[in-house]
Protein backbone atom coordinates (compact mmCIF):
# COMPACT_ATOMS: atom_id res chain seq x y z
CA UNK A 1 0.00 0.00 0.00
CA UNK A 2 1.28 3.44 -0.96
CA UNK A 3 0.44 6.57 1.01
CA UNK A 4 0.54 10.05 -0.52
CA UNK A 5 0.26 13.47 1.12
CA UNK A 6 0.80 15.51 -2.06
CA UNK A 7 -1.54 15.81 -5.05
CA UNK A 8 1.02 15.56 -7.87
CA UNK A 9 2.55 12.28 -6.71
CA UNK A 10 -0.86 10.64 -6.25
CA UNK A 11 -2.00 11.80 -9.68
CA UNK A 12 1.09 10.39 -11.34
CA UNK A 13 0.62 6.97 -9.75
CA UNK A 14 -3.05 6.85 -10.75
CA UNK A 15 -2.16 7.86 -14.31
CA UNK A 16 0.28 4.95 -14.44
CA UNK A 17 -2.42 2.51 -13.33
CA UNK A 18 -4.80 3.90 -15.96
CA UNK A 19 -2.17 3.67 -18.68
CA UNK A 20 -2.02 -0.02 -17.81
CA UNK A 21 -5.78 -0.25 -18.40
CA UNK A 22 -6.81 -0.57 -14.76
CA UNK A 23 -10.06 0.81 -13.37
CA UNK A 24 -10.18 2.89 -10.17
CA UNK A 25 -12.71 2.98 -7.33
CA UNK A 26 -12.53 5.75 -4.74
CA UNK A 27 -13.66 5.90 -1.11
CA UNK A 28 -13.44 9.38 0.44
CA UNK A 29 -13.38 9.38 4.27
CA UNK A 30 -12.54 11.61 7.20
CA UNK A 31 -10.74 8.82 9.00
CA UNK A 32 -11.37 7.08 12.33
CA UNK A 33 -12.33 4.12 10.20
CA UNK A 34 -14.85 1.52 11.36
CA UNK A 35 -16.56 -1.47 9.79
CA UNK A 36 -18.89 0.82 7.86
CA UNK A 37 -15.94 2.39 6.06
CA UNK A 38 -14.39 -1.01 5.44
CA UNK A 39 -17.66 -2.14 3.85
CA UNK A 40 -17.26 0.75 1.40
CA UNK A 41 -13.71 -0.41 0.71
CA UNK A 42 -14.92 -3.96 0.09
CA UNK A 43 -17.54 -2.66 -2.34
CA UNK A 44 -14.88 -0.60 -4.11
CA UNK A 45 -12.77 -3.74 -4.43
CA UNK A 46 -15.67 -5.51 -6.15
CA UNK A 47 -16.04 -2.67 -8.64
CA UNK A 48 -12.51 -1.91 -9.79
CA UNK A 49 -8.92 -3.07 -10.10
CA UNK A 50 -7.45 -0.31 -7.92
CA UNK A 51 -8.90 1.09 -4.68
CA UNK A 52 -8.01 4.61 -3.56
CA UNK A 53 -9.02 5.86 -0.10
CA UNK A 54 -8.68 9.44 1.11
CA UNK A 55 -8.42 10.44 4.76
CA UNK A 56 -9.07 14.14 5.24
CA UNK A 57 -11.00 15.94 7.98
CA UNK A 58 -12.48 18.67 5.80
CA UNK A 59 -12.73 21.96 7.71
CA UNK A 60 -15.01 23.50 5.09
CA UNK A 61 -17.96 21.25 5.94
CA UNK A 62 -17.96 21.82 9.71
CA UNK A 63 -20.35 24.44 11.03
CA UNK A 64 -19.03 24.25 14.61
CA UNK A 65 -15.40 24.72 15.61
CA UNK A 66 -15.75 22.33 18.55
CA UNK A 67 -17.05 19.59 16.26
CA UNK A 68 -14.04 20.02 13.97
CA UNK A 69 -11.58 20.06 16.87
CA UNK A 70 -13.16 17.02 18.55
CA UNK A 71 -13.43 14.90 15.41
CA UNK A 72 -11.46 11.69 16.11
CA UNK A 73 -8.14 11.41 14.27
CA UNK A 74 -6.60 7.92 14.25
CA UNK A 75 -4.34 7.88 11.19
CA UNK A 76 -1.99 5.07 12.22
CA UNK A 77 -4.85 2.72 13.09
CA UNK A 78 -6.66 3.70 9.89
CA UNK A 79 -3.66 2.85 7.74
CA UNK A 80 -3.32 -0.53 9.43
CA UNK A 81 -6.97 -1.32 8.64
CA UNK A 82 -6.59 -0.26 5.02
CA UNK A 83 -3.45 -2.37 4.67
CA UNK A 84 -5.49 -5.33 5.88
CA UNK A 85 -8.05 -4.65 3.16
CA UNK A 86 -5.42 -4.61 0.43
CA UNK A 87 -5.99 -0.98 -0.55
CA UNK A 88 -3.48 0.18 -3.17
CA UNK A 89 -3.39 3.95 -2.58
CA UNK A 90 -4.20 6.21 0.37
CA UNK A 91 -4.35 10.00 0.13
CA UNK A 92 -3.72 11.86 3.41
CA UNK A 93 -3.46 15.57 2.57
CA UNK A 94 -3.30 18.43 5.06
CA UNK A 95 -5.66 21.42 4.94
CA UNK A 96 -2.75 23.41 3.52
CA UNK A 97 -2.51 21.02 0.57
CA UNK A 98 -6.24 21.07 -0.15
CA UNK A 99 -6.78 24.77 0.59
CA UNK A 100 -3.40 26.46 -0.03
CA UNK A 101 -4.91 29.96 -0.02
CA UNK A 102 -7.21 29.32 2.93
CA UNK A 103 -10.94 28.69 3.03
CA UNK A 104 -11.91 32.31 2.43
CA UNK A 105 -10.25 32.36 -1.01
CA UNK A 106 -11.32 28.88 -2.06
CA UNK A 107 -13.52 28.48 -5.13
CA UNK A 108 -16.54 26.49 -4.02
CA UNK A 109 -19.13 24.17 -5.52
CA UNK A 110 -22.72 24.36 -4.32
CA UNK A 111 -25.71 22.34 -5.48
CA UNK A 112 -28.76 24.65 -5.44
CA UNK A 113 -31.97 23.68 -3.73
CA UNK A 114 -31.08 20.40 -2.08
CA UNK A 115 -28.07 21.91 -0.26
CA UNK A 116 -30.28 24.40 1.57
CA UNK A 117 -33.18 22.21 2.67
CA UNK A 118 -33.60 19.81 5.59
CA UNK A 119 -30.18 19.45 7.27
CA UNK A 120 -28.77 22.14 5.01
CA UNK A 121 -31.20 24.71 6.40
CA UNK A 122 -29.84 24.33 9.93
CA UNK A 123 -26.20 23.85 8.90
CA UNK A 124 -25.50 26.66 6.43
CA UNK A 125 -22.45 26.00 4.31
CA UNK A 126 -22.20 22.33 5.27
CA UNK A 127 -23.16 20.85 1.92
CA UNK A 128 -21.19 23.53 0.11
CA UNK A 129 -18.16 22.21 1.97
CA UNK A 130 -19.04 18.63 1.09
CA UNK A 131 -19.60 19.41 -2.60
CA UNK A 132 -16.39 21.40 -2.85
CA UNK A 133 -14.10 18.82 -1.28
CA UNK A 134 -15.69 15.90 -3.14
CA UNK A 135 -15.32 17.77 -6.45
CA UNK A 136 -11.65 18.45 -5.69
CA UNK A 137 -11.04 14.84 -4.72
CA UNK A 138 -12.86 13.58 -7.82
CA UNK A 139 -10.67 15.87 -9.93
CA UNK A 140 -7.50 14.59 -8.25
CA UNK A 141 -8.33 10.87 -8.27
CA UNK A 142 -10.36 10.70 -11.51
CA UNK A 143 -12.11 7.50 -10.40
CA UNK A 144 -14.42 5.31 -12.43
CA UNK A 145 -16.47 4.60 -9.31
CA UNK A 146 -16.96 6.40 -5.99
CA UNK A 147 -18.51 4.70 -2.94
CA UNK A 148 -20.49 6.53 -0.25
CA UNK A 149 -22.51 5.31 2.72
CA UNK A 150 -26.28 5.66 2.65
CA UNK A 151 -26.25 6.68 6.32
CA UNK A 152 -25.57 10.24 5.13
CA UNK A 153 -28.66 10.16 2.94
CA UNK A 154 -28.92 13.82 2.01
CA UNK A 155 -25.17 14.06 1.45
CA UNK A 156 -25.38 11.17 -1.02
CA UNK A 157 -28.26 12.90 -2.82
CA UNK A 158 -26.23 16.12 -3.03
CA UNK A 159 -23.20 14.29 -4.45
CA UNK A 160 -25.30 12.43 -7.01
CA UNK A 161 -26.94 15.67 -8.16
CA UNK A 162 -23.57 17.42 -8.34
CA UNK A 163 -22.06 14.57 -10.36
CA UNK A 164 -24.97 14.70 -12.81
CA UNK A 165 -25.02 18.50 -13.09
CA UNK A 166 -21.28 18.72 -13.75
CA UNK A 167 -21.37 15.80 -16.22
CA UNK A 168 -18.69 13.93 -14.28
CA UNK A 169 -17.92 10.53 -15.77
CA UNK A 170 -18.05 8.81 -12.39
CA UNK A 171 -20.52 6.21 -11.14
CA UNK A 172 -21.59 7.16 -7.61
CA UNK A 173 -22.41 4.00 -5.65
CA UNK A 174 -24.45 4.05 -2.45
CA UNK A 175 -23.73 1.37 0.16
CA UNK A 176 -26.19 0.33 2.86
CA UNK A 177 -25.70 1.52 6.44
CA UNK A 178 -23.73 -0.84 8.67
CA UNK A 179 -25.05 -1.18 12.22
CA UNK A 180 -23.84 -2.33 15.59
CA UNK A 181 -25.52 -5.38 17.14
CA UNK A 182 -27.93 -3.11 19.05
CA UNK A 183 -28.99 -1.23 15.90
CA UNK A 184 -26.88 1.91 16.27
CA UNK A 185 -25.61 3.11 12.91
CA UNK A 186 -21.82 2.91 12.81
CA UNK A 187 -20.19 6.34 12.85
CA UNK A 188 -16.76 7.77 13.58
CA UNK A 189 -18.41 10.08 16.10
CA UNK A 190 -19.64 7.12 18.18
CA UNK A 191 -16.17 6.93 19.72
CA UNK A 192 -16.87 10.28 21.41
CA UNK A 193 -19.78 8.83 23.40
CA UNK A 194 -19.38 8.12 27.10
CA UNK A 195 -20.28 4.65 28.38
CA UNK A 196 -23.68 5.91 29.54
CA UNK A 197 -24.34 7.75 26.27
CA UNK A 198 -23.39 4.69 24.25
CA UNK A 199 -25.96 2.63 26.16
CA UNK A 200 -28.68 5.16 25.28
CA UNK A 201 -27.61 5.76 21.68
CA UNK A 202 -29.66 2.90 20.12
CA UNK A 203 -32.83 4.78 21.10
CA UNK A 204 -32.38 6.82 17.92
CA UNK A 205 -32.66 3.74 15.70
CA UNK A 206 -35.51 2.32 17.80
CA UNK A 207 -37.45 5.56 17.49
CA UNK A 208 -36.86 5.55 13.75
CA UNK A 209 -38.24 2.02 13.52
CA UNK A 210 -41.26 3.15 15.56
CA UNK A 211 -41.91 5.94 13.05
CA UNK A 212 -41.68 3.44 10.21
CA UNK A 213 -44.12 1.08 11.93
CA UNK A 214 -46.54 3.92 12.63
CA UNK A 215 -46.56 4.97 8.98
CA UNK A 216 -46.89 1.39 7.75
CA UNK A 217 -49.76 1.03 10.19
CA UNK A 218 -51.65 3.78 8.42
CA UNK A 219 -50.66 7.00 10.19
CA UNK A 220 -50.25 9.84 7.74
CA UNK A 221 -50.41 12.68 10.28
CA UNK A 222 -46.68 13.15 9.88
CA UNK A 223 -46.36 16.24 12.07
CA UNK A 224 -48.01 14.37 14.94
CA UNK A 225 -45.82 11.31 14.36
CA UNK A 226 -42.75 13.55 14.55
CA UNK A 227 -44.00 15.07 17.81
CA UNK A 228 -44.48 11.62 19.33
CA UNK A 229 -41.01 10.55 18.18
CA UNK A 230 -39.51 13.71 19.64
CA UNK A 231 -41.09 12.88 22.99
CA UNK A 232 -39.59 9.37 22.85
CA UNK A 233 -36.11 10.76 22.28
CA UNK A 234 -36.43 13.25 25.12
CA UNK A 235 -37.70 10.54 27.45
CA UNK A 236 -34.39 8.72 26.88
CA UNK A 237 -32.41 11.93 27.51
CA UNK A 238 -31.52 12.45 23.87
CA UNK A 239 -31.74 15.99 22.58
CA UNK A 240 -33.74 15.89 19.33
CA UNK A 241 -32.09 17.82 16.54
CA UNK A 242 -34.07 17.14 13.38
CA UNK A 243 -36.71 14.66 12.26
CA UNK A 244 -37.99 14.73 8.69
CA UNK A 245 -40.39 12.46 6.84
CA UNK A 246 -40.21 13.22 3.14
CA UNK A 247 -40.41 11.86 -0.39
CA UNK A 248 -37.36 9.70 -1.06
CA UNK A 249 -36.82 11.12 -4.57
CA UNK A 250 -37.42 14.84 -4.01
CA UNK A 251 -36.75 15.19 -0.27
CA UNK A 252 -39.87 17.37 -0.30
CA UNK A 253 -43.14 16.87 1.56
CA UNK A 254 -44.93 13.60 0.88
CA UNK A 255 -47.77 13.87 -1.64
CA UNK A 256 -50.41 11.52 -2.99
CA UNK A 257 -47.96 10.64 -5.77
CA UNK A 258 -45.19 9.57 -3.37
CA UNK A 259 -44.43 5.85 -3.41
CA UNK A 260 -41.53 5.84 -0.95
CA UNK A 261 -40.61 7.96 2.03
CA UNK A 262 -37.35 8.48 3.86
CA UNK A 263 -37.13 9.15 7.58
CA UNK A 264 -34.17 11.42 8.35
CA UNK A 265 -33.24 11.78 12.01
CA UNK A 266 -30.56 13.41 14.11
CA UNK A 267 -30.16 13.90 17.85
CA UNK A 268 -27.50 14.94 20.32
CA UNK A 269 -26.13 12.79 23.12
CA UNK A 270 -24.00 15.17 25.10
CA UNK A 271 -21.88 16.94 22.49
CA UNK A 272 -22.13 14.11 19.96
CA UNK A 273 -24.54 14.42 17.05
CA UNK A 274 -25.97 11.12 15.82
CA UNK A 275 -27.75 10.65 12.49
CA UNK A 276 -29.76 7.87 10.91
CA UNK A 277 -32.31 7.25 8.17
CA UNK A 278 -34.68 4.64 6.84
CA UNK A 279 -36.48 4.27 3.52
CA UNK A 280 -39.96 2.75 3.49
CA UNK A 281 -42.66 2.00 0.95
CA UNK A 282 -45.85 4.05 1.09
CA UNK A 283 -47.90 2.00 -1.38
CA UNK A 284 -49.94 -0.28 0.88
CA UNK A 285 -51.92 -3.31 -0.14
CA UNK A 286 -55.10 -1.26 0.25
CA UNK A 287 -53.82 1.38 -2.16
CA UNK A 288 -52.84 -1.32 -4.64
CA UNK A 289 -56.34 -2.82 -4.41
CA UNK A 290 -57.90 0.59 -5.07
CA UNK A 291 -55.66 1.03 -8.13
CA UNK A 292 -56.67 -2.39 -9.45
CA UNK A 293 -60.39 -1.66 -8.93
CA UNK A 294 -60.02 1.71 -10.67
CA UNK A 295 -58.26 0.05 -13.60
CA UNK A 296 -61.13 -2.41 -13.96
From Swiss-Prot:
<comment type="pathway">
    <text>Cofactor biosynthesis; (R)-pantothenate biosynthesis; (R)-pantothenate from (R)-pantoate and beta-alanine: step 1/1.</text>
</comment>
<dbReference type="GO" id="GO:0004592">
    <property type="term" value="F:pantoate-beta-alanine ligase activity"/>
</dbReference>
<feature type="binding site">
    <location>
        <begin position="149"/>
        <end position="152"/>
    </location>
    <ligand>
        <name>ATP</name>
    </ligand>
</feature>
<dbReference type="GO" id="GO:0005829">
    <property type="term" value="C:cytosol"/>
</dbReference>
<feature type="binding site">
    <location>
        <position position="178"/>
    </location>
    <ligand>
        <name>ATP</name>
    </ligand>
</feature>
<feature type="binding site">
    <location>
        <begin position="186"/>
        <end position="189"/>
    </location>
    <ligand>
        <name>ATP</name>
    </ligand>
</feature>
<dbReference type="InterPro" id="IPR003721">
    <property type="entry name" value="Pantoate_ligase"/>
</dbReference>
<feature type="binding site">
    <location>
        <position position="61"/>
    </location>
    <ligand>
        <name>(R)-pantoate</name>
    </ligand>
</feature>
<feature type="binding site">
    <location>
        <position position="61"/>
    </location>
    <ligand>
        <name>beta-alanine</name>
    </ligand>
</feature>
<dbReference type="GO" id="GO:0005524">
    <property type="term" value="F:ATP binding"/>
</dbReference>
<keyword id="KW-0436">Ligase</keyword>
<comment type="similarity">
    <text>Belongs to the pantothenate synthetase family.</text>
</comment>
<keyword id="KW-0963">Cytoplasm</keyword>
<protein>
    <recommendedName>
        <fullName>Pantothenate synthetase</fullName>
        <ecNumber>6.3.2.1</ecNumber>
    </recommendedName>
</protein>
<dbReference type="InterPro" id="IPR014729">
    <property type="entry name" value="Rossmann-like_a/b/a_fold"/>
</dbReference>
<feature type="binding site">
    <location>
        <begin position="30"/>
        <end position="37"/>
    </location>
    <ligand>
        <name>ATP</name>
    </ligand>
</feature>
<dbReference type="GO" id="GO:0015940">
    <property type="term" value="P:pantothenate biosynthetic process"/>
</dbReference>
<keyword id="KW-0547">Nucleotide-binding</keyword>
<keyword id="KW-0566">Pantothenate biosynthesis</keyword>
<feature type="binding site">
    <location>
        <position position="155"/>
    </location>
    <ligand>
        <name>(R)-pantoate</name>
    </ligand>
</feature>
<keyword id="KW-0067">ATP-binding</keyword>
<dbReference type="Pfam" id="PF02569">
    <property type="entry name" value="Pantoate_ligase"/>
</dbReference>
<comment type="subunit">
    <text>Homodimer.</text>
</comment>
<comment type="function">
    <text>Catalyzes the condensation of pantoate with beta-alanine in an ATP-dependent reaction via a pantoyl-adenylate intermediate.</text>
</comment>
<feature type="active site" description="Proton donor">
    <location>
        <position position="37"/>
    </location>
</feature>
<dbReference type="InterPro" id="IPR004821">
    <property type="entry name" value="Cyt_trans-like"/>
</dbReference>
<dbReference type="InterPro" id="IPR042176">
    <property type="entry name" value="Pantoate_ligase_C"/>
</dbReference>
Amino acid sequence: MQTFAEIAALREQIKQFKRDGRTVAFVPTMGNLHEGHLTLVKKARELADIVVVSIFVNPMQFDRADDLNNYPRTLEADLNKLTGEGVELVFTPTPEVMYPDGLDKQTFVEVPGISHMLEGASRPGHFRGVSTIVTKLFNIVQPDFACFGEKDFQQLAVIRQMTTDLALDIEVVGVATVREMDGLAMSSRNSNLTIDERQRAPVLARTMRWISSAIRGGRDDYASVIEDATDQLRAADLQPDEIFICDVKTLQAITSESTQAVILMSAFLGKTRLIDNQVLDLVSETKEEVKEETAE
